Amino acid sequence: MARKKLKKRKLLISLFFLVSIPLALFVLATTLSKPIEISKETEEIDEQQVFIDSLSGHAQILYEKYHVLPSITIAQAILESDWGNSELAAKANNLFGVKGNYKGHHVTMETDEVEKGKRKTIRAKFRKYSTFFESMDDHAQLFVRGTSWNKKKYKPVLEAGNYKEAATALQTSGYATDPDYADKISAIVEKYDLDEYDEVNPSLKSVDLNASIKDSAVQDVWSKPSTDDRSIRLTSAQSYVGKDIKVVSKKQKGQSVWYQFQINDKLIGWIDDSAVEIKEAT
């Protein structure tokens, strides 16, 4: 009797292992087949600062040439184009709401105007540009050449000693019909510390070079040279291998040289010159 009980117990133990071991192996295999989730914070890119960085260098180049304060140029671009996101900026690369034709090109769009204290919507022609930089160039030249009926219309803007004086001059010169225009421009300058760009930067040059990213490039693309304070990493240079690029700005600091480039007339960012292959002019 004792032997029968012992045999029965051994049988039950054997059955237990026969069932439990495959089940355990199945659970283990199922667990291992699932991807291991690692907690990872996605680094958010400050698109507003990237927009400022993309324009600040060229704004300083124009300041040296035309004496339009960079803080005013950038603040107007922010206000008029909604950080480059407006329909006018998207369709015509027009950052400043400049009306009329540019070299025979324009778009017709609705716009709000204030007349005799009342706001109304009208349809008007706006200048169409190939690039944001072309829009900035024309904006600076507008202040220099004035209008057909008043060549000195914007002279007070050029003579302003600081952004507050320049913003007031914009208002009194009739650049915009918004009665709060000067206050809005000054507020943007102060919020984003744009007056830090109000100086000539001899390390910056405007260039026009056809180029490509080297296949072996391991560098990153930045919102401005990575050696500058608060520069933002945008992507890897490998993202643009095989694409034609246009180098539009050059910055040299000691032995370090950086290029700002665009693709299909769209600004991309800054990259170390060692990642770039300049094509010879044909």
Swiss-Prot record:
Protein name, as recorded: Exo-glucosaminidase LytG
InterPro entries the UniProt entry points to: Glycosyl_Hydrolase_73, GW_dom, GW_dom_sf, MGlyc_endo_b_GlcNAc-like_dom
Key words of the record: Cell wall, Cell wall biogenesis/degradation, Glycosidase, Hydrolase, Magnesium, Secreted, Signal
Record flagged with keyword Metal-binding: no
GO cellular-component term (any): extracellular region
Gene that encodes the chain: lytG
Lineage: Bacteria, Bacillati, Bacillota, Bacilli, Bacillales
Organism from which the protein derives: Bacillus subtilis (strain 168)
Regulation of this protein's activity per its record: Inhibited by EDTA.
Signal peptide: 1-29
A GO term for molecular function: hydrolase activity, acting on glycosyl bonds
